[in-house]
Amino acid sequence: MLGLRAMLPKGKHFAVVLGNVSRQITLPHNCRCITSASWTRPQQSQPQNFQQNRWLSVKSTKTESDDALQRIYYGTLAPRMKMVKFFSLSTSLAGLAAQPILLEQGMKIGGTGMAVFLCTVGGFFTFVTPLLLHFITKKYVTELHYNPLTEEYTATTISLLLQKIKTTFRPNDVVVPEVPGMFTSFLVNKRPLFVDPALFDDPEHYVKIMGYDKPIDFKLDLTPNPEKSKTSEEKQ
């Protein structure tokens, strides 16, 4: 009995030592997992870094092209035109809001005929006025920018709802009509645009856009026409 009691503490110490040894043996396995995870994470992050670099490169090219734009023309009538169109749109909205009131008052005054007449007059000034102003001012170029990197021009016009419309073109895309229409200086892809030559910062841009730097074409028909020669021979 005394021998068993003496061996029990030693057995406890032996079990503790075995536990520590087993823990030390499992450590390399954990280290392998950690090292494998550390090797796989950079491989997974490589596509993300590539996408970020690609996005940054595309963004940098866009900013460079935007910064390269030079304003060479500014329409002095642009602020007044915006104010007039804004006032017209506001009065049109007020006219739409007043339509039920006009209808009610017309029914009280003269019945259905008077109500239709008042609504027609109110609707005419509500819809026709902003459309007429837009028809006159839609060709007016408020700003004209030039990109020396691509040698392209960007013309800015105003839409019906006071939004900017940008038209990018090159001098080869410009067509100057023989008989210019009302408020039309040149055509870009069959779209008329109007500019004031005196408002250009550099007149050379206007000369380049209008094609005045090219040789003059007198449109002389110097090619022989066989039909005309036949008719002249028959007369002789």
Swiss-Prot record:
Single Gene Ontology BP annotation = mitochondrial proton-transporting ATP synthase complex assembly
In which domain of life is the source organism classified?
Answer: Eukaryota
Task: Show which residues constitute the signal peptide.
Answer: none
UniProt topology in membrane: Multi-pass membrane protein
Q: Which GO terms describe its cellular component?
A: mitochondrial inner membrane; mitochondrial membrane; mitochondrion
Q: Where are the transmembrane segments?
A: 83-103, 116-136
Write the record's keywords in alphabetical order, separated by commas: Membrane, Mitochondrion, Transit peptide, Transmembrane, Transmembrane helix
Q: Give the transit peptide, as a residue range.
A: 1-64
Localization recorded for this chain is:
Mitochondrion membrane
In Pfam terms, one family for this protein is TMEM70
Q: What is stated as this protein's family in its record?
A: Belongs to the TMEM70 family.
Q: What does this protein do?
A: Scaffold protein that participates in the c-ring assembly of mitochondrial ATP synthase (F(1)F(0) ATP synthase or complex V). Also binds the mitochondrial proton-transporting ATP synthase complex I and may play a role in the stability of its membrane-bound subassemblies.
Per UniProt, subunit arrangement is:
Associates with mitochondrial complex I assembly intermediates during its biogenesis.
Q: What is this protein called?
A: Transmembrane protein 70 homolog, mitochondrial
